[in-house]
Amino acid sequence: MEGQRQESHATLTLAQAHFNNGEYAEAEALYSAYIRRCACAASSDESPGSKCSPEDLATAYNNRGQIKYFRVDFYEAMDDYTSAIEVQPNFEVPYYNRGLILYRLGYFDDALEDFKKVLDLNPGFQDATLSLKQTILDKEEKQRRNVAKNY
């Protein structure tokens, strides 16, 4: 069991190295393998020590989501960010990443909720503060345009 845990950790470390080098296809394959391995461990009767840590699993989902975001597969990326949040609800980064996509797609109310959650979890997250302010401004502008269009 210890060997499986070390192998899983090595997979995650290698995935991160590929990610940092911009080798996204390799990183995505390794993150996916890690996520599958965690799902198998969680669904089997293995001892709790053999399962993946929530932090590592959430990081794998978040980083795989980033790769999908880079490919402009926004909905798939949001699925991974949501999975990261479900595994580790106090991990602010996937809320921020999902909020960015929601903002880009024009779902300002949902983006606002994610950015507010980031700041609840980490009040010093400057990019989230800026994104929240920009989302509010763009939502107000959209509302002004809609009102003007209806006259």
From Swiss-Prot:
<keyword id="KW-0802">TPR repeat</keyword>
<dbReference type="Pfam" id="PF13181">
    <property type="entry name" value="TPR_8"/>
</dbReference>
<feature type="repeat" description="TPR 1">
    <location>
        <begin position="8"/>
        <end position="41"/>
    </location>
</feature>
<feature type="repeat" description="TPR 3">
    <location>
        <begin position="92"/>
        <end position="125"/>
    </location>
</feature>
<dbReference type="Pfam" id="PF13432">
    <property type="entry name" value="TPR_16"/>
</dbReference>
<dbReference type="InterPro" id="IPR019734">
    <property type="entry name" value="TPR_rpt"/>
</dbReference>
<dbReference type="InterPro" id="IPR011990">
    <property type="entry name" value="TPR-like_helical_dom_sf"/>
</dbReference>
<feature type="repeat" description="TPR 2">
    <location>
        <begin position="58"/>
        <end position="91"/>
    </location>
</feature>
<dbReference type="Pfam" id="PF00515">
    <property type="entry name" value="TPR_1"/>
</dbReference>
<protein>
    <recommendedName>
        <fullName>Tetratricopeptide repeat protein 32</fullName>
    </recommendedName>
</protein>
<keyword id="KW-0677">Repeat</keyword>
